């Protein structure tokens, strides 16, 4: 968890824009523009759409002149980004826009359920003897818990944890899950689970991964909106296979 207010202040002091990826939190839980950010990015593929059937992104911002930037460019932020969008061709299709607008209708209720389930699972994992560590901003044990409380109204549905053991134990756990789907994406109504060491970060050497805290026993969950008792039962049964 990063201090958005502090980052924005440092960026502005040096004549730079502050951009925040708000995909995990969504506008339901965090509004970076109100915290000093200039640009907010969303992978709308994820929570804003919420149904795993769109590939789309968006930038949100309050328009402003860019004369204060170190490069001295005088056009507005909107004009600059609109030019880049036109030049690059990053324009979504009508059907993609329709699907995201459909998802936005249920964003608030979905995010509340994502968070409730994630918190429940995080607390369960934190007390399990086969789990080494749980990282979820909603837990008091999270090192940036107080910071998260100061800039968000919720903590979302993403969490990571480390299993006691290494690659063999983690692999057995992942092979045993029934409700969770083994996949790299996130933010849909269905629960996903992934193993960064052999999936999203497989190309990074072990020594570099471990410096980043991404060991062979790290697991990431995108907690969906299913019945939480079913999700916990799936996790508990899978941990019993280790």
Predicted feature locations:
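Conserved PLP-enzyme active-site core in the AAT-like
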Residues: 1-130, 135
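PLP-dependent enzyme catalytic core of the Aspartate aminotransferase-like
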Residues: 4, 110, 175, 191-242
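Structural motif
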Residues: 15-18, 38-39, 58, 98, ...
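Active-site beta-loop-alpha junctions enriched in small/polar residues
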Residues: 23-25, 139, 164, 224-226
């Amino acid at each position: 968890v990063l201090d958005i207010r502090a980052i924005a202040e440092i960026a502005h002091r040096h004549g730079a824009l502050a951009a925040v990826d708000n995909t995990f939190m969504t506008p339901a839980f965090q509004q970076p523009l109100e915290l000093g950010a200039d640009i907010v990015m969303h992978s709308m593929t994820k929570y804003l759409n919420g149904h795993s059937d769109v590939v789309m992104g968006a930038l949100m911002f309050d328009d402003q002149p860019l004369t204060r930037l170190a490069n001295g460019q005088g056009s507005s932020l909107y004009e600059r980004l609109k030019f880049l969008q036109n030049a690059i061709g990053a324009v979504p299709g009508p059907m993609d826009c329709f699907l995201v607008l459909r998802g936005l209708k249920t964003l608030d209720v979905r995010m509340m359920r994502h968070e409730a389930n994630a918190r429940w699972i995080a607390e369960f994992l934190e007390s399990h003897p086969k789990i080494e560590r749980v990282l979820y901003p909603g837990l008091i044990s999270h090192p940036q818990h107080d910071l998260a409380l100061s800039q968000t109204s919720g903590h979302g549905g993403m969490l990571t944890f480390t299993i006691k053991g290494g690659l063999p134990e983690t692999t057995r756990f992942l092979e045993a899950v029934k409700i969770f789907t083994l996949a790299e994406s996130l933010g849909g109504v269905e629960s996903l689970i992934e193993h960064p060491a052999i999936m999203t970060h497989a190309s990074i050497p072990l020594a570099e991964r471990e410096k980043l805290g991404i060991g062979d026993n790290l697991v990431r969950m995108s907690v969906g909106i299913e019945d939480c008792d079913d999700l916990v039962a799936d996790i508990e049964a899978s941990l019993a296979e280790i």
